[in-house]
Amino acid sequence: MIRTRFAPSPTGYLHIGGVRTALFNWLLAKQAGGQFILRIDDTDAGRNVDAALKPILDGFRWLGMDWDEGPDVGGPHGPYFQSERGDQYRAAAEKLLADGHAYRDFAKPEELQTLREEAQKGGEAFVYDRRWMAEDEATAAKFEAEGRQGVVRLKMPREGQCVIQDLIRGEVVVEWASEQDHVIARADGSPLYHLASVVDDHELKITHVVRAAEHLPNTARQVFIAQSLGYELPIYAHLPYVAEPGGSAKLSKRKLDKYKKNRDFAVLLAHGEKIAERCNMQVDADTFNPVLVDFYREIGFLPDALLNYLLLLGWSLDGETEKFTIAEMIEKFTLDRVNKAPASFDPAKLQSFQGDAFAELSDEKRTELVRPFAVAAGFVADGDADETLKAVLAAAGDRLKMAGDIVDFDYCFVDDYSVDEKAYEKRLAKADGAKELLAKLNETLKAATEFDAANVETTVKSFCESEGIKIGQIIHALRVATTGAASGFGMFDTLAVLGKDKVTARIEKTIAGLS
């Protein structure tokens, strides 16, 4: 049985790149009828694990990516937190020491730094000569008496090669001489990443280690640990990393200021911030950004649309097909179609996927998803009927690309809507005759007996004919006067949704402001 895993650290957020890696593991397991395991790498004792883990688990649940074993669901191979597996790591370290594949080392950091600098001056690669290695208890006691602290290092081979068969990279050959004697346990006995990861993968019976390419340099030393402990090696597959928008560097949550210079990224972030502000969301500025999954959940993205887009970051079925249901992803996904090159994160394409998916929803589902945002923004109250909301959604059509986009149509619900100052200046304040035309049109609208979209259109067009003007000479001023916006869904649909009383009152208020 195929068993894959995703092993996040409890950082308090779920990174887009991490989710893409988790998705590929999840799909591989699902397709084969295997199991997907969630393991928590929580060896940092200073971190509040429960608080930091919750957003990660919530993110996976929102995405619909269930796990067969791990936090909250348990399983036969637990515990699933590294902080609870100390005995296993200590036993593995002791076996490596006993079998001569590791040693206790008492070098001080500053001594190692001096050796590195000397090697650098001589133009040579630094290779630790093990001069502070304790080969027996007497030597260890001597070093301890000097106030030194002993760590556990791997005793790496100095000759030969490590040959790694990677499902994506092919055959990868690493010269053992290029590997350092890596530290695998601290002086207090607590494990470091390489030891813990190998032991966990073995004891959790992981068959396929599918992870980002940045871990490829770790693989030879992990192979050495596994073979030294007598473990069967898993199958390795190293994915291309997710690159930043318009660039080749790895996507990082720490480079938000840089990404804001990318137009599409900046537009997405600004829109998210607008939704958060209007809906009174309590968001963390450090984690509310498009590099992290929670951003999309907060602003009303569809999880399936996000997963569909992430699937294509490094994978392709035939170079043409882009839209997949979750069932189709599971059916079609194979590792042999994963690219080696990094895939650049494209905010505009992601939004396009979201818009297409949202447009395919039923009217009832769209209303269900949008309603919480409308309530949070104060557009409707809990328990209110949805007539106005449904009318706005019907009129907005594909202009509404995600649930949070309802904030763009605040003018349909409330009178404290935002006003586009540039549009106001251009279409009203500095437009010759706009005030007079609006005043005349308003009297015509007040006299209208029917105010549905079709009748309003007839009324406005008849007014233009009687005034000898083209509709373009009044329609833009009319939109700004009644909505404050430079653009939106159909003008006559907009007027019908607002209703005659609200339309005429807003025109009167606008005229008064132009006096």
Swiss-Prot record:
<keyword id="KW-0030">Aminoacyl-tRNA synthetase</keyword>
<dbReference type="GO" id="GO:0006424">
    <property type="term" value="P:glutamyl-tRNA aminoacylation"/>
</dbReference>
<keyword id="KW-0648">Protein biosynthesis</keyword>
<protein>
    <recommendedName>
        <fullName>Glutamate--tRNA ligase</fullName>
        <ecNumber>6.1.1.17</ecNumber>
    </recommendedName>
</protein>
<dbReference type="InterPro" id="IPR033910">
    <property type="entry name" value="GluRS_core"/>
</dbReference>
<keyword id="KW-0067">ATP-binding</keyword>
<comment type="function">
    <text>Catalyzes the attachment of glutamate to tRNA(Glu) in a two-step reaction: glutamate is first activated by ATP to form Glu-AMP and then transferred to the acceptor end of tRNA(Glu).</text>
</comment>
<keyword id="KW-0963">Cytoplasm</keyword>
<dbReference type="GO" id="GO:0008270">
    <property type="term" value="F:zinc ion binding"/>
</dbReference>
<dbReference type="GO" id="GO:0000049">
    <property type="term" value="F:tRNA binding"/>
</dbReference>
<dbReference type="InterPro" id="IPR000924">
    <property type="entry name" value="Glu/Gln-tRNA-synth"/>
</dbReference>
<feature type="short sequence motif" description="'KMSKS' region">
    <location>
        <begin position="250"/>
        <end position="254"/>
    </location>
</feature>
<dbReference type="InterPro" id="IPR008925">
    <property type="entry name" value="aa_tRNA-synth_I_cd-bd_sf"/>
</dbReference>
<feature type="binding site">
    <location>
        <position position="253"/>
    </location>
    <ligand>
        <name>ATP</name>
    </ligand>
</feature>
<dbReference type="InterPro" id="IPR004527">
    <property type="entry name" value="Glu-tRNA-ligase_bac/mito"/>
</dbReference>
<comment type="subunit">
    <text>Monomer.</text>
</comment>
<keyword id="KW-0547">Nucleotide-binding</keyword>
<dbReference type="InterPro" id="IPR014729">
    <property type="entry name" value="Rossmann-like_a/b/a_fold"/>
</dbReference>
<dbReference type="GO" id="GO:0005524">
    <property type="term" value="F:ATP binding"/>
</dbReference>
<dbReference type="Pfam" id="PF00749">
    <property type="entry name" value="tRNA-synt_1c"/>
</dbReference>
<feature type="short sequence motif" description="'HIGH' region">
    <location>
        <begin position="8"/>
        <end position="18"/>
    </location>
</feature>
<dbReference type="GO" id="GO:0005829">
    <property type="term" value="C:cytosol"/>
</dbReference>
<dbReference type="InterPro" id="IPR020751">
    <property type="entry name" value="aa-tRNA-synth_I_codon-bd_sub2"/>
</dbReference>
<comment type="similarity">
    <text>Belongs to the class-I aminoacyl-tRNA synthetase family. Glutamate--tRNA ligase type 1 subfamily.</text>
</comment>
<keyword id="KW-0436">Ligase</keyword>
<dbReference type="InterPro" id="IPR049940">
    <property type="entry name" value="GluQ/Sye"/>
</dbReference>
<dbReference type="Pfam" id="PF19269">
    <property type="entry name" value="Anticodon_2"/>
</dbReference>
<dbReference type="GO" id="GO:0004818">
    <property type="term" value="F:glutamate-tRNA ligase activity"/>
</dbReference>
<dbReference type="InterPro" id="IPR045462">
    <property type="entry name" value="aa-tRNA-synth_I_cd-bd"/>
</dbReference>
<dbReference type="InterPro" id="IPR001412">
    <property type="entry name" value="aa-tRNA-synth_I_CS"/>
</dbReference>
<dbReference type="InterPro" id="IPR020058">
    <property type="entry name" value="Glu/Gln-tRNA-synth_Ib_cat-dom"/>
</dbReference>
